[in-house]
Structure formats: structure tokens, C-alpha cells
């Protein structure tokens, strides 16, 4: 990424005069003052006034690092937040366990939420430090730590930002040559991604087709086995159904006989009850003759006892028959219930038979569909072979592109190394020339001091000479005046 051209101005004497030329031995870049760092970073649209740079806070360093990573590394704040979310998803099982503990201990819910916030902020801080460490390592600073973010020191921040400014200037100087290589590399990467995506898509398609073929073969085998089992089960049910029909016919005849016998016995019981009532009436009539004719009464009693014994015998027979009939009725009811269950089972069997016929129709359709799928599979196999050949050709192209890219990258690295060596040589020559210039300035200042001293001595001698000349003139004038007086 090219930076604004104002960051590097070789002819700007105001920036050069403010630069501090003392270099830390382990660093390969000059240490700049806070004012120059602020101007250079602001020219790159970073928030960096002199007060913030000279008195950095933790929050400002975090904001500045996010801006630097977004501009130079392409790692935005949204990317960092996405990484934090991925880390939180990986800890989801632990979070569920903690949630279960929170349900058992609800009084710890607030502290758990605070712990989650602390974990999120800590993960974000670690990811920010990793990205910044990688960037500063490229710039030449290999000792960037978390304390530089949490408790920044002005001198360390000054050194780190000096490395950033130096890196930005170097990129600005070589941006024209690097942009071509970057564009070529990006194009190669895009082609590589497209080919890889196509490769993965074809692989997934091949796997899906293999899975469908195996599933169809497995389903067909299961359907054949299930059909045989259903046929065997249906034949058994048909035999049982025939037996049940015969039993039903026999039980129906017995049930009709039972009904006739029951009706006959009920009629006979009614007749006996009627006879008992009539006998009771006759007994009431005979009571009046009890005392008048004991012999007749005795005979009647004997006859009645005989009739009673016969009636009791008949009654016992009827009761036993009644019990037997009740048991038969209950057994018939059970049989009838079983018949109803059997009819219901028969209906289910018939439904199963209809379903079986439907399944057979579907099976025929599936077999036809399978044949079509086999034809389609053959076509797909041919297509897969074609795609495989294309994939091999593409892989060869990718290898050639990678080889070309590596060669170009190696050439660009060599060129960058030579440019960096030239830059270091120029910096050293500039330092030597500046030292010579300082020596010349000191020599000139000494000469000016000597000239000023000589000038002052010359002025003093000049004034003394002028005074001597004035005295001499006055003596000459006085002498001439006296000589004129003597001549006159």
C-alpha cells in the first residue's frame, strides 16, 4: 500500500534539522523526536498529535495499533472481533458447563458475566499484541511486549514509532517497484483460490455421488430382504386367518346351539316356576283338609315330598346347566373379543398388503430410476475423468505460476536488499558529510573569532596611528608657525 508522498521529503531541511542522529546500537533506523513522529503519522491520516505521542496512554496505544494494523497489515478491528468470536465459540462447551453451575448457584451470575467480559477483553488484547508484534518485527523492533500496550513508556513508544515512520518512508520510496509485484502476486493468488475452490467443489461432488451410489445399493439390498420377510409373514398370517375362520364357523354354530338351549331351559324354568306356584296353591287348598283326613294328608305329603325331591333334582340340574351356560357365555365373549382382535389384525395385514403392493410399485420405479442414475453416473464418470485431466493441467499451471511467483519474489527480495544496502550506505555517507560540515562550521567560527580579534586590534592600531598623525600634524603646524615668525 502506497503512503502519502508528504511522509518522505528529502529536500525538507526543517524536518532534517530536527532529527536526532543518535542511533541505538541494535536498531537499524534513526531515532526521531516526538514532533517529527507526530507530523509524519498525521500526514498518513493517523491520530497522532505531539501530546498523545509524548504522553501515551493504554487506550491511545490500542487505537493507534488498530489503525496501523488496518493500514499496513490489512487486519481491521472487525477481523479481530471475528477472531475473538471464534475463540469464544471454541470455549462453548466450557461455557455451557459454567452456565449449568450458574443455574445451580444463581448468586454467582453477576461475577460470571464479568469474567466473560474480562476473558473477551484479554483475548482481544492478546490478538492485538500478536498482530502488532508481527508488524513491528517487520519494521525492525523485535522486543515489543504486552507492557508496551498496558503501560506505555514515552521513550519506548518513541523508538517504536520511529521504526514505523522509517518503514513507511522505505515503502514510499519503493512503492512504484513493489506495487507491480504485489499486483502480479495478487492476481496469481486469485487464480490459485479459484482453482482450489473448483477443485474442492469437484471433490465434494465426487464424494456425494459415491455416497448416493452406495446408499442406493444398500437401500436396494435392504428392500429385497424386507420384501422376502413380508411375503413369509403374510403367508403365515393367511394360514392363521384360514384356521381362525374355521374356528369362527364352529364357534358360531355352537353359539347358535347355546342360544337355543338357553331359550329352551328358560322356558322349562318358567314352566317349573308355574308348577311350583300351582302346587303352592293346591297346598293352601289342602291345608283345610289336614285334620279331617290324616291318611289322605299323609299320602299327599308323601306325594309332595316325592315331587319336591324331583323338583329339587331338576333344579340342581338346571343350576348346574345354568352355571355351565354362564361359563360358556363368558368363554364365547372372550372368543368374540379375540375374533374382533383377529379381524383388526386382518385389516392391518390387508393394509400391509396394500402398502406392500405400493412398495413394489415404488421399487419398480426406483429400479427404473436406478438405471437412469447408472446412465447419469456413467456420464458423470466421463465428466470426472475430463475434470481430472483439467485439474491435472490446472495443477501444472499452478506449479508454473508458483515457480514464477517464487522467482519474481526472490528477485524482488534481492532488489529490496540491494536498495536497503544502498540506503544504509547513503545514511552513513550523510552522517560522515554532516560531521565534516560540523567541523568546517567550527573552523569557520574559529576563523571568524580570530578575524574579529584582528579587526579589533587593527582598529586600535588605526586609532593610535591617527592620534600619532594628529599629534605630528600639530607639531608640524606649530613648527611651521614658529619658522614663519622667525623668517618675518
Swiss-Prot record:
InterPro entries: Kinetochore_Nuf2_N (IPR005549), Nuf2_DHR10-like (IPR041112), Nuf2_N_sf (IPR038275). Its main location: nucleus. It comes from the Eukaryota. Residues 101-115 have a biased composition (Acidic residues). Residues 96-115 are annotated as: Disordered. One of its GO terms (biological process) is mitotic spindle organization. It is found in: Nucleus; Chromosome, Centromere, Kinetochore. Residues 186-479 form a coiled coil. The keyword Metal-binding does not apply. GO terms for molecular function: microtubule binding; protein-containing complex binding. One of its GO terms (cellular component) is nucleus. PANTHER family: KINETOCHORE PROTEIN NUF2 (PTHR21650:SF2), MEMBRALIN/KINETOCHORE PROTEIN NUF2 (PTHR21650). Belongs to the NUF2 family. Acts as a component of the essential kinetochore-associated NDC80 complex, which is required for chromosome segregation and spindle checkpoint activity. This is Probable kinetochore protein NUF2. It comes from Debaryomyces hansenii (strain ATCC 36239 / CBS 767 / BCRC 21394 / JCM 1990 / NBRC 0083 / IGC 2968) (Yeast). The lineage of its organism: Eukaryota, Fungi, Dikarya, Ascomycota, Saccharomycotina.
Amino acid at each position: 500500500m502506497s503512503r502519502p508522498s508528504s511522509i518522505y521529503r528529502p529536500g525538507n531541511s526543517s524536518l532534517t534539522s530536527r532529527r536526532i542522529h543518535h542511533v541505538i546500537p541494535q536498531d537499524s533506523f534513526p531515532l526521531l523526536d516526538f514532533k517529527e513522529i507526530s507530523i509524519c503519522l498525521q500526514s498518513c491520516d493517523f491520530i497522532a498529535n505531539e501530546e498523545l505521542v509524548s504522553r501515551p496512554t493504554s487506550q491511545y496505544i490500542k487505537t493507534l495499533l488498530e489503525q496501523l494494523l488496518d493500514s499496513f497489515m490489512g487486519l481491521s478491528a472487525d477481523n479481530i472481533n471475528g477472531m475473538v468470536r471464534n475463540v469464544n465459540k471454541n470455549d462453548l462447551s466450557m461455557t455451557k458447563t459454567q452456565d449449568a453451575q450458574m443455574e445451580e448457584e444463581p448468586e454467582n451470575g453477576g461475577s460470571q458475566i464479568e469474567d466473560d467480559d474480562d476473558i473477551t477483553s484479554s483475548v482481544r488484547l492478546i490478538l492485538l499484541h500478536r498482530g502488532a508484534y508481527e508488524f513491528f518485527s517487520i519494521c525492525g523492533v523485535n522486543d515489543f511486549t504486552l507492557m508496551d500496550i498496558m503501560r506505555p513508556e514515552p521513550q519506548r513508544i518513541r523508538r517504536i514509532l520511529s521504526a514505523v515512520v522509517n518503514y513507511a518512508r522505505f515503502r514510499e520510496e519503493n512503492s512504484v517497484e513493489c506495487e507491480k509485484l504485489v499486483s502480479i502476486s495478487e492476481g496469481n493468488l486469485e487464480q490459485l483460490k479459484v482453482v482450489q475452490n473448483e477443485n474442492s467443489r469437484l471433490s465434494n461432488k465426487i464424494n456425494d455421488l459415491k455416497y448416493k451410489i452406495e446408499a442406493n445399493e444398500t437401500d436396494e439390498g435392504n428392500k429385497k430382504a424386507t420384501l422376502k420377510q413380508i411375503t413369509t409373514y403374510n403367508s403365515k398370517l393367511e394360514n392363521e386367518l384360514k384356521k381362525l375362520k374355521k374356528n369362527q364357523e364352529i364357534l358360531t354354530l355352537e353359539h347358535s346351539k347355546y342360544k337355543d338351549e338357553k331359550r329352551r331351559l328358560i322356558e322349562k324354568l318358567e314352566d317349573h316356576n308355574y308348577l311350583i306356584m300351582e302346587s303352592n296353591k293346591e297346598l293352601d287348598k289342602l291345608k283345610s283338609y289336614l285334620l279331617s283326613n290324616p291318611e289322605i294328608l299323609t299320602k299327599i305329603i308323601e306325594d309332595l315330598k316325592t315331587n319336591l325331591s324331583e323338583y329339587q333334582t331338576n333344579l340342581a340340574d338346571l343350576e348346574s346347566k345354568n352355571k355351565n351356560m354362564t361359563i360358556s357365555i363368558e368363554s364365547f365373549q372372550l372368543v368374540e373379543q379375540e375374533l374382533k382382535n383377529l379381524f383388526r389384525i386382518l385389516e392391518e395385514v390387508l393394509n400391509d398388503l396394500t402398502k406392500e403392493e405400493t412398495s413394489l410399485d415404488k421399487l419398480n420405479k426406483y429400479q427404473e430410476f436406478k438405471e437412469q442414475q447408472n446412465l447419469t453416473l456413467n456420464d458423470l464418470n466421463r465428466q470426472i475423468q475430463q475434470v481430472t485431466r483439467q485439474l491435472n493441467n490446472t495443477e501444472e499451471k499452478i506449479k508454473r505460476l508458483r515457480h514464477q511467483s517464487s522467482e519474481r519474489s526472490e528477485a524482488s527480495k534481492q532488489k529490496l536488499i540491494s536498495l536497503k544496502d544502498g540506503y544504509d550506505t547513503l545514511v552513513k555517507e550523510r552522517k560522515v558529510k554532516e560531521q565534516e560540515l560540523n567541523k568546517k562550521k567550527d573552523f569557520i567560527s574559529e576563523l571568524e573569532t580570530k578575524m574579529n580579534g584582528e579587526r579589533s586590534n587593527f582598529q586600535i592600531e588605526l586609532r593610535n596611528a591617527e592620534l600619532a598623525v594628529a599629534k605630528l600634524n600639530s607639531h608640524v603646524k606649530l613648527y611651521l608657525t614658529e619658522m614663519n615668525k622667525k623668517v618675518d
